[in-house]
Amino acid sequence: MQHRLDLVDVNYVYMPRKSSAFQEYLDSMSLRNSALKASYENQLVVRTGYSFTYNSAGNAMMRTPTKNSYSIRANIEEAGNLLYAASKLVHPNPKDGEDYVLANIPFAQYVKADFDFAKNFMIDPRNSFVFHIGVGVAYPYGNSKMLPFEKRYFSGGANSVRGWSVRSLGPGVYKGSEDGRMDFINQAGDIKLDLNIEYRTHLFWKLNGAAFVDAGNIWTIRDDSGQEGGLFKFNEFYKQIAVAYGLGIRLDLDYLILRFDGGMKAINPVETGKKRYPVIRPRFSRDFAFHFAVVS
């Protein structure tokens, strides 16, 4: 069991230079794409956080478990409340639309919480099932209309829904850029859900095989015209959960594991009709994503 308290963590995002033409472009995009404009602004993040980690297997991490075990990870953090209170005392009435600042630098204000649970079921010494659920929610308020870019959630990739490349899924049913390319700025959200079940088997030497099914997506808390279809709604979100399946190889080097995964899209929430279910008529060039990861 491990507890960690971060009393003060300071992060300053500084843009050294923006040309006047680029600044005019960002200003023109502020209504259509607020996420893009916010990503190129100076910002101070002063956060306080607490995290809790527990593994029933003790010091042995769940990389290649040898018995039934489970792990829990929880984290909560907040940023900007003390700075906001101090700014209210010094400058109680800023002009309409202006942020509170510290030394002329806007600061972020938000609260964020994450929870992860993983359970390992041993079938025999060579075979096991692992179930994982991860949930995260972050809410910007007060001095922030949007989370700092590095605090937003992303979906797809080796540790998420593996039928999609990293940061290429969501939010919701957002389709990405008009030209079909990945849109890292807008394909981010304030809410994240990841579900995973994986069958693992020892092959030979230090190699293990895996077969998996992943599900999940991300969503935004506030409606944004630049992320159309990304808003979280209780009566809609379950229809927007993406599903993937695939196979993987694990090279267990004791001190770390090399993971190689190939995922295929099974349910694509962005599409409609028959295209929504690529599992029925899979197309390798369209539905496949390869992932490599190192687990320490």
Which role fits each region the language model picked out?
Residues 1-201, 211-234:
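C-terminal outer-membrane beta-barrel translocator/porin domains of Gram-negative envelope proteins
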Residues 67-69, 124-128, 204-206, 253-257, ...:
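Strand-connecting loop/turn motifs
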Residues 98-99, 149-150, 229-234, 241-243, ...:
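Short beta-alpha connecting loops at secondary-structure transitions
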Residues 196-198, 242-250:
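Short glycine-rich, acidic/polar surface loops and turns
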Residues 215-232, 255, 263-281, 296:
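C-terminal beta-signal and adjacent terminal beta-strands/loops
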Residues 251-256, 282-296:
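Outer-membrane beta-barrel "beta-signal"
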